[in-house]
Amino acid sequence: MLKKLLLLISLLALPAFADTTAEISHLLNYVKTTDCKYIRNGKIHTGSEGAKHITAKYDYFKDDIKSTEDFIRLSATKSTMTGSKYYIQCPGSSKVESGKWLLSELKKYRAK
């Protein structure tokens, strides 16, 4: 009975895991392909460089990430060494915190 219950619980968790994986993949591609600049520790990077850095942090924090929001919070919002926030600077716009920018895109993605 316990085995069946555990199997059922794990099967129910699969769609959520798949959704999270798809959302994270979308956000990484969004950063990678953007015309916006990724500002980390005061230095300006391309979206591709930003995505590479976020991916490295994602790999490091993978065991602690249970949701896409965890991914954003742990991998894409601030430096773990300096505590400095990451920012996004899009052409013709004011810079915004990367976490807010990514949460906004996540909301759009989920609405599709």
Regions found by a protein language model. Give the residues of each.
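N-terminal secretory signal peptides
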Residues: 18-57
